[in-house]
Design a protein with these regions (language model features):
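Channel- or pocket-lining gating/hinge segments that regulate access to a cavity or pore
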Residues: 283-286
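A short N-terminal helical cap/helix-turn-helix that marks the beginning
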Residues: 201, 290-311
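Active-site "cap" helix and flanking loop/linker of ATP-utilizing ligase/carboxylase catalytic domains
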Residues: 133-167, 175-230, 309
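Glycine-rich active-site loop/lid that clamps phosphate-bearing ligands
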Residues: 211-267
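Short, well-ordered beta-strand elements within core beta-sheets of diverse protein domains
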Residues: 54-56, 87, 133, 270-279, ...
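Acidic/polar loop patches that form or flank catalytic/metal-binding clefts of enzymes
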Residues: 18-20, 157-158, 204-210, 231-235, ...
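Cofactor-binding beta-sheet edge motifs in enzyme active sites
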Residues: 150, 260-276
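N-terminal beta-alpha lobe that positions the nucleotide/phosphoryl donor
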Residues: 1-160, 164-181
Length: 311
């Protein structure tokens, strides 16, 4: 499922809604293909991830340069310059369904996460459940995710990602792994997804079924980065002079940083992901903002103020 184009083709076979797309080859008339799909279009790396190898194109004039730029970035980042054209939705939400499967034929979905707050096509605030998903959408999207997993014969933890516009949704990609934002799902369903993933790898059956899952409250996660929002979120590496996670709000901190650590240019500049759970979305947002404000971090320029203002 690391190949996004192959994944789209499989999802079409499974009856999962997909956006129009076509692989860019040497024989393809790219300008004609984009006209057929309809602008705006997205040039997208098939082996991509993390927002790399992607270009939004509004008009024909910028298409060829965008294709070449995406191919170069894809080759440098993934060792594969395969790119494709896909219809771009100007107004949409990034909503994903957490799935779990075992080797005994059991499959469940753990409801949705909203991941629309992004910069440079990378998520920075995630929440569950999505404020835009009705019970009807949740049921249909969950069924589509299960259909996708069945088509793949999937076991272990994974994510089926969709674009949502109004009450319609389209397949985006499958992430065949546990994602950074999985804690928000754990918080609202009260299950340990890492534990289930390990149990499945050991040949055990899932410890719960679909009927035993329900949504309790609201969870939000923020990604605290060493970066400068005023300079287009440019990474800001350097020493961590002081790091003291807040002790209020019963927040969950996932981090490998401590006082004295060095944030380098060789790796992603994430300092921590911070997750809170509360009875309502409003309470969760306020609680997370307060947790971030009362976390002590010195020596680095961070996106903390941006996160607090966004919340």
């Amino acid at each position: 499922m690391g190949d996004k184009l192959s994944a789209k083709n499989l999802m079409t076979e499974a009856g999962v809604p997909t956006l129009p797309a076509i692989e860019i080859t040497d024989k393809l008339d790219v300008l004609k293909a984009a006209d057929e799909i309809g602008y705006p279009v997205l040039v997208k790396a098939s082996a991509g991830g993390g927002g790399r190898g992607m270009r939004i194109v509004e008009t024909q004039e910028g298409l060829e340069a965008a294709v070449e730029g995406a191919k170069r970035e894809a080759l440098n980042s993934f060792g594969d310059d395969t790119v494709f054209l896909e219809k771009w939705l100007d107004v949409s939400r990034h909503v994903e369904i957490q799935i779990l499967g075992d080797t005994h034929g059991n499959l469940v979905h753990c409801f949705e996460r909203e991941c629309s707050i992004q910069r440079r096509h990378q998520k920075i605030i995630e929440e569950a459940p999505s404020p835009a998903v009705t019970e009807d959408i949740r049921e249909r999207m969950g069924a589509a995710a299960i259909a996708a997993a069945k088509k793949l014969g999937y076991s272990s933890a994974g994510t089926v990602e969709f674009l949502l516009s109004g009450d319609e949704f389209w397949f985006l990609e499958v992430n065949a792994r546990l994602q950074v934002e999985h804690p928000v799902t754990e918080e609202i369903i009260g299950k340990d997804l890492v534990r289930e993933q390990i149990r499945v790898a050991e040949g055990e059956a899932l410890s719960f079924n679909q009927e035993e899952l329900s949504i309790e409250g609201h969870a939000i996660e923020a990604r605290l980065y060493a970066e400068n929002p005023e300079k287009n979120f440019l990474p800001s590496p350097g020493p961590v002079i002081a790091w003291e996670p807040s002790t209020i709000g019963r927040a969950r901190f996932d981090s490998g940083v401590e006082t004295g650590s060095i944030i380098t240019t060789e790796f992603d500049p994430m300092i921590a992901k911070v997750t809170v759970h509360a009875p309502t979305r409003r309470e969760a947002a306020a609680r997370l903002a307060r947790v971030l404000e009362t976390t002590r971090i010195q020596g680095l320029t961070t996106n903390r103020d941006f996160l607090v203002n966004t919340l």
